[in-house]
């Protein structure tokens, strides 16, 4: 399946997911109001309390051949106390099933894609939905260097500037940098609705993809103990914990630095594989080509 079709499947899944989450929040709000006057307001669980009660009503209704209204009355349920509420929960379950269907369609589409088959499936912690995000939004034809993948996912660094827009330097005269965020906007070229090149100021990266890679994939890889990338994470984390420049930073800061480094290495390897698979030129990284540094994993 083409990446455009995977992107459409992915967006449809997230639309369904957003509607399901909004509906679940609304249901919890509705059922929580029943206990507003209680001194000890219970913590309501959608799965444990409401959905299990829904199944209980269904089972009783079928076994006793009674109406929904009569079943609710006989069971003296705590949460679902009317046929209207029963139907609202029933509609929510339909949303759950729809989301599962869209997930299966997306998985089927991704599992036939060569990038998933030959690269992403080997990474422990990277499932089909995460793979879909990567395949749908990264383009090896547009990315002439691995750093383009880093920039598009917001994992490049930005030179820090003062209030006058001047670069800030440290005591050694080196530019101070920071991780890219939503406040870091730049002018860039884009194709307008008339098909013409134009310039506008805005984000140069995909914030949603960044949050997926750092907030979800990175932690999944570490928990799954992927033999390649979790090692990169722990090696880099140990390294910065012993560097004078970084050793006094908080543990969470060091953890975030190590996760970003790990994902950047993953994206670099992905870029190399994908460019070769598409018979496109592959270049050395900036650190190797321009700074004469050894590549990651070099045996010193």
Set out the residue ranges of the language-model regions.
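Long, charge-rich intrinsically disordered scaffolds of nucleic-acid metabolism proteins
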Residues: 1-112
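Conserved aromatic-histidine-acidic binding/catalytic patches
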Residues: 4, 8-11, 15, 90, ...
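Short, hydrophobic/amphipathic alpha-helical patches that form generic packing surfaces
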Residues: 4-25, 29, 132-137, 211-219, ...
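Eukaryote-specific, cytoplasm-facing alpha-helical/coiled-coil scaffolding segments in long proteins
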Residues: 42, 238-245, 288-300
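Coiled-coil termination/hinge junctions
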Residues: 98-131, 135-140
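Phosphate-backbone recognition surface of nucleic-acid-processing proteins
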Residues: 119-120, 134-256, 260, 273
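A glycine-rich phosphate-binding loop feature that marks nucleotide/adenosyl-phosphate handling sites
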Residues: 125, 166-167, 172-175, 286-292
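Basic, amphipathic alpha-helical segments enriched in Lys/Arg and hydrophobic/aromatic residues
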Residues: 250-287, 295-298
């Amino acid at each position: 399946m083409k990446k455009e079709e995977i992107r459409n499947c992915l967006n449809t899944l997230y639309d369904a997911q957003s509607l399901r989450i909004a509906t679940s929040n609304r249901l919890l709000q509705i059922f929580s109001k029943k206990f507003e006057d209680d001194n000890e307001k219970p913590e309501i669980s959608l799965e444990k309390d409401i959905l299990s009660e829904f199944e209980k009503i269904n089972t009783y209704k079928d076994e006793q051949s009674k109406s929904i209204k009569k079943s609710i009355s006989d069971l003296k349920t705590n949460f679902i106390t009317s046929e209207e509420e029963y139907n609202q929960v029933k509609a929510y379950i339909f949303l759950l099933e729809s989301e599962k269907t869209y997930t299966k369609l997306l998985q089927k589409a991704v599992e036939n894609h060569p990038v998933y088959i030959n690269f992403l499936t080997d990474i422990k912690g990277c499932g089909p939905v995460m793979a879909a995000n990567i395949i749908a939004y990264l383009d090896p034809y547009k990315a002439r260097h691995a750093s383009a993948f880093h920039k598009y996912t917001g994992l490049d660094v930005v030179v820090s500037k003062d209030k006058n827009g001047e670069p800030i330097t440290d005591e050694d005269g080196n530019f101070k940098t920071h991780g890219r965020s939503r406040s870091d906007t730049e002018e860039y070229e884009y194709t307008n609705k008339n098909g013409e090149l134009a310039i506008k100021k805005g984000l140069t990266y995909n914030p949603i993809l960044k949050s997926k890679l750092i907030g979800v994939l990175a932690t999944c890889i570490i928990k799954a103990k992927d033999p390649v990338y979790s090692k990169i994470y722990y090696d880099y984390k140990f390294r910065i914990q012993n560097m004078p420049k970084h050793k006094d930073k908080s543990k969470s800061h060091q953890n975030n630095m190590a996760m970003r480094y790990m994902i950047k290495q993953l994206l670099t390897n992905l870029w190399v594989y994908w460019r070769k698979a598409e018979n496109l030129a592959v270049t050395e990284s900036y650190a190797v080509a321009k700074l004469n540094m050894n590549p990651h994993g070099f045996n010193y």
